[in-house]
Each structure stands twice: as structure tokens, then as C-alpha cells.
Amino acid sequence: MSVHELALQRSKYKHLTDDEWRWFLQQVEGRERTADKLPTFAAIEDWWYPVRLSCEQCSSELTARYKASLVSGEKMVDLTAGYGVDTYFLSEQFKKADYVEQNEELCRIAKHNFEFTIHNSQLKIHHATAEDYLSSLSGEVGRGLDLIFADPARRDNHGGKVFRLEDCTPNVVELLPTLLSHLTPKGRIMLKLSPMLDITQAVKELSAVSIQWSVYVVAVKNEVKEVLLLSRKSKDESQKTDITAIDLAEPEKAFIFTREEERNCALINGDATLNGGFLYEPNAAILKAGAYKLVAQRYGLQKLDVNTHLYVSDTLIENFPGRVWQINSQCTIHDAQGSQANVLCRNYPLTPEQLKKKLHLRDGGTAFVIGCRVNGKPTLFYAERV
């Protein structure tokens, strides 16, 4: 029975107070909504769930485990712990961990969940803001953190979305000197950012003489879920920011590069076969990371247009990190009318819905009609997925 169906059965649960009933529905809905997202928690019978928004905003188990694979040490703190998904999996890599959260209800839920399930018996719950927690640290203890993790809230006081790091809460740009002062010599800062934030601008805002940043653009099944910044201490100001674009559905195809490599990359010139050749679209992580030219160079592809992030080759490139089609033909509006096909538009004058309507296309099948610009000219391809 779904939570919506259950909500209509209030009369059968008269023994529950209104508060108990709301809590009961919250638990049913939380388990229902996160069963696939958080399978480890779903398998624990007495696991508690927070309100819907917290369940929606929390990391998935897959992305949380990936973050945990990047770090290890003696002690860590999660300054914006929320539901505690990242805290749970990150803490497995450390001997001691602090959970910091300003929402009292989330702290209550975390205390219950971590009390009997966490692998780390040294995890402590702190009901506090990030700023107050940091202010409470002092002496050698205050300089003993091997990891400071934060996922700054990306909404203002009125609930509106913000897109600059300095407008998020806590303001990690302002807090950066304080964060650095609490790290061990090999300690690191990890920030989880929105996919909507400008990566280059975020790194620039967090620039400091003593540290460099590694960037991780993390996608799952071609949807970017989060952008991670992980600090590394360095006095070499010439050291470049490395960027890893990874889709956790195909982690072996991770694409690692620097902005300088992309900037200095020259595109391949030539005349690839557009009929019978192969068409490529990099995965969402690579596109978000901005490796538009470098992906062409590394895989020996030709880019269709400076502003069209589609690529072609005469022969099939194996293990390409993204989608691949075989081009059956270029086609005109008249050629494509009335058939059944999936529609994709990239740098094309019409949206997929507009093109579909114009062509009188029915959804489905294995064929694709792909609209894009080739050397500035709107072009249609009729293709099949490889």
C-alpha cells in the first residue's frame, strides 16, 4: 500500500495521536521514496526517515560511497550533515567523526539511526551551526581534522535559489581561512556543490595560496548529480586544477583533464563521412566539466560545429564515454515526416517538441532524428543507437 492510499485509512488508526499518525506516514513515505536511492538504510528495520524535502535533497548511497572512496584519515567532520547520508559513508573511512546540523529534528533522527548502526562508535552528534561548531574548537584538538566536509545550502532566506558560492549557507568562501586552520598538515576540505554552479568561478572564489583544488563532476546514468571540490595543500601556484568527469554507471570511463589542456587543444580538421559514419555525444559529466575540444582530440573525433557538442568518425570508437549512433543518412524535413523515431536537438533552431510536431513524428522505436548545426547550418541526421 502506498503512502497516499494509507493516508486515506486514518479511521483505522484511531489509537494514534495526530502527531504519531504524521510520524507514521513520514516513515512509510521515506522508506517508499528512498528504497532504491538508499538500499543499505532500507534494509534496516528500525531506520528513521526525515521529512520529504530532506529525503529528496540527500545524496544517494552510490554518490556518497564515491565521495568516501576519495578520502581517509583519523578524524572528520560533516558541517552540514542533514539526514546524515554522507556522514554515514564518509565516517567509515575515519576513526572519529562529528555530525554537525542546526536542525534539531534531523539531529534527533541521526542520533537514533547512528546509535545502533554506524560502524564508527566514535561518531558524535552536534546540534549547532557550522560557524558555532568551528568556534567551539580550540588548541590541538581544533587542529586535528583530516577532513572537513560541507554541502552548503543553495537557497536564500526567502527560499530562492542562489548560484554563487558566497551566497550559500554556510559561506565557505568567508570561512575558508578558519577551515584551513583546523586541518592537520595533510587534512583536506571537501565541498559538495550544485551542478548549476559555475565550476571555474567556484574555484576562483576559493583560491588560496596554500591550497589547490581537484574537481569531480559526478553523474549517474547521464544525469549530473553533484560537483565536488577536494582541496590539496600545495605551495606551487603553477600547479593546475585537475578535473575528473565520471558517470558512476560507467566508472571505468572517467575522463580526467585540466582547463589548460582544454584551452590549448586544437580540433581535428578533416572530412569525416556523415552518411554511414558514427555520431557521438559525450556523457553529461564531460559536458558539464567543459572538455568540449579535448574529448575530440583524445578519441580522434571531429566536432560538427564550434557550438555543437556532437562529434563524428568514420570508424566506431570503442568504449566512448557517452552515447553513440550510426548515421544512416542526412535527411530533409520532408524525408523524416510521418515516421516513428526518438528526437534529439543540440544547437538546433527548434526544440525536440517543436521538431517532432513539424515532422509529425510518433515517439518510440529504435531510430533517432537528430537535429544540430554542422558548420553553422541546421542539419538533420537519421541514425540508430550503437
Residues of each region from the PLM?
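SAM-dependent transferase fold signal centered on methyltransferase-like domains
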Residues: 1-386
